[in-house]
Curated annotation (Swiss-Prot):
Binding sites annotated in the UniProt record for NAD(+): G13, A14, A15, G16, N17, I18, S19, N107, Q114, V131, G132, N133
Domain of life: Bacteria
Active site: H189
InterPro entries given in the database record: L-lactate/malate_DH, Lactate/malate_DH_C, Lactate/malate_DH_N, Lactate_DH/Glyco_Ohase_4_C, Malate_DH_AS, Malate_DH_type2, NAD(P)-bd_dom_sf
Keyword rRNA-binding in annotation: no
Family that this chain belongs to: Belongs to the LDH/MDH superfamily. MDH type 2 family.
Spans traversing the lipid bilayer: none
Protein name: Malate dehydrogenase
Amino acid sequence: MSMKQPVRVAVTGAAGNISYAMLFRIASGEMLGKDQPVILQLLEIAPALDALKGVVMELEDCAFPLLAGIVQTDDATVAFKDVDYALLVGSRPRGPGMERKDLLEANAAIFSAQGKALNDVASRDVKVLVVGNPANTNALIAQRNAPDLDPRNFTAMTRLDHNRAMAQLAGKTDSTVNDVKKMIIWGNHSSTQYPDLTASTVNGKLALDLVDRTWYEGTYIPEVQQRGAAIIKARGASSAASAANAAIAHMRTWVLGTDENDWVSMGVYSNGEYGIAKGLIYSFPCTCTNGDWSIVDGVDVSSAFSKEKMAATEQELSEERDAVAHLLP
């Protein structure tokens, strides 16, 4: 197998739990393919640089054939220099007594700076995935601070929600996730997201013909919406490995394409599709080909139930945007 030229992959919050579950898989070729060498450009805050050094030592000790180089830094302009892919994992977690608005503002400062740095030094075709929460609004903040980059280059991760929704449906219908197609997560990566089974199939049969409507509305949707909180309660820590897995899958799909007759959920720049306000980063069903995404057309969202759920999560995203509006260029 002939090797390609190395590509540059930036990861922020690189000494954190999600990154620890992700970096070794990126370096082994799981994200971009077994013929694609990578240079990892790792960003951390100064107090975590020692911890990052330990992670880098471990990466070296794996002797990955595809790992063509490693940069470790606390300077965003160094980390993002010429990068082709940027996974923005690091964010300010919610501390005791912090209101959601405080959290939004603390993260706005981080993602404004990162958006500016990407704008200044990244590849013009950089693909950006925001994992750090609140992911949709953090992606919007970064995008607004990078006026020279195409807004389509900025995405937020709802693939974890998508995967959670697939797993729950497979469990209920006594099938495997391979049997589940055309899952949709609409809206925000938060508890207002709308896991929509209207178009979903299991083994070619419509999902909503196989499950009870009461279960769907009363059990399934809240379970998917609140799965992250359930994991924190059970594990005493937030989901890291499953988030890392979803981030790798999101990027891999964006770069290498979706399966035929299926789609994925991605938080992407709204151009008014399905009546969603333009400029929000909203999760839509998407297909990917040739390194580009497009929103799936023609999903039936005419039911009062769908309209209400899609509007509620859109409203939350609008409120988040308005809370940081004074910080947006």
